[in-house]
């Protein structure tokens, strides 16, 4: 059972965070909020998402698992404007969820959870390099790199105490270094890995709105991005596998 109302902007932000990686997912409702954990079809990127009940104007739910077409929900919530409230209502064992926004009333058929990939386990990975940077700065560097390449190297230089992002195209090169004065914090541990910009572009759009993004790195290891949404009443973690660098 779920019965809730929430600001349209807050819920749109939440749905966009999920839709950056997957078109559908299993949403878990509970008395304290909504969560999901999902991996993309290529097993390259994963999201762990939490939206606390405090993010909602009203919230009442029991423990359940529902299959949601995130792409469809994203299009529906685009109907909402600033200051609009979204109403969500789902009865026990129901196959449709009632959604109301900006005077529009939808009856959305839920997906069969048996057709959706099971929630992935949270991997235990040691990522000693840690940087906290503004989401806007991070996204700007990603966008700049995407102009000339489809991949980007991220790393930490402990000697210079900098966080750097480097991209190489066929004939072009771009590098951006962030010193300690441009970062919220930095753990000066050597780290460097290469990542696909196809994934980072979509992640970057979501992270651009975050005041702070924690970036955790290793050497030829995945990268973990952690940041808050919904005024601190929600949290998102992205985990992205590295690309193998050619010799």
Curated annotation (Swiss-Prot):
GO terms (BP aspect): leading strand elongation; regulation of DNA replication
Molecular functions per Gene Ontology: DNA binding; DNA polymerase processivity factor activity
Pfam families the UniProt entry points to: PCNA_N
The UniProt record lists the keyword Ribonucleoprotein: no
Xref: SUPFAM superfamilies: DNA clamp (SSF55979)
Key words of the record: DNA replication, DNA-binding
UniProt-listed InterPro entries: DNA_clamp_sf, Pr_cel_nuc_antig, Pr_cel_nuc_antig_N
Quaternary state and interactors: Homotrimer. The subunits circularize to form a toroid; DNA passes through its center. Replication factor C (RFC) is required to load the toroid on the DNA.
Protein's job: Sliding clamp subunit that acts as a moving platform for DNA processing. Responsible for tethering the catalytic subunit of DNA polymerase and other proteins to DNA during high-speed replication.
Family designation: Belongs to the PCNA family.
Protein's UniProt name: DNA polymerase sliding clamp
Provenance organism: Methanoregula boonei (strain DSM 21154 / JCM 14090 / 6A8)
Gene symbol of the encoding locus: pcn
């Amino acid at each position: 059972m779920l019965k809730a109302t929430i600001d349209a902007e807050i819920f749109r932000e939440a749905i966009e965070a999920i839709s950056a990686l997957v078109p559908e997912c299993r949403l878990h409702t509970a008395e304290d909020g909504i969560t999901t954990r999902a991996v993309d079809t290529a097993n390259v990127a994963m999201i762990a998402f939490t939206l606390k009940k405090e993010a909602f104007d009203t919230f009442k739910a029991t423990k359940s698992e529902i299959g949601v077409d995130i792409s469809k929900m994203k299009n529906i919530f685009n109907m909402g404007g600033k200051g609009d409230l979204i109403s969500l209502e789902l009865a026990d064992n129901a196959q449709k969820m009632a959604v109301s926004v900006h005077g529009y009333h939808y009856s959305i058929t839920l997906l069969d959870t048996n057709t959706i990939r099971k929630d992935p386990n949270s991997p235990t990975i040691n990522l000693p390099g840690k940087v906290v940077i503004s989401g806007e700065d991070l996204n700007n560097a990603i966008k700049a790199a995407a102009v000339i390449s489809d991949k980007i190297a991220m790393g930490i230089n402990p000697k210079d105490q900098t966080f750097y992002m480097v991209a190489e195209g066929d004939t072009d090169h771009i590098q951006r270094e962030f010193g300690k004065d441009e970062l919220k914090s930095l753990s000066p541990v050597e780290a460097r890995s290469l990542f696909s910009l196809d994934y980072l572009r979509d992640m970057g759009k979501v992270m651009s709105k975050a005041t702070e993004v924690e970036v955790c790195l290793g050497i030829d290891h995945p990268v973990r991005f952690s940041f808050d949404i919904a005024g601190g009443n929600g949290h998102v973690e992205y985990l992205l596998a590295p690309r193998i660098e050619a010799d």
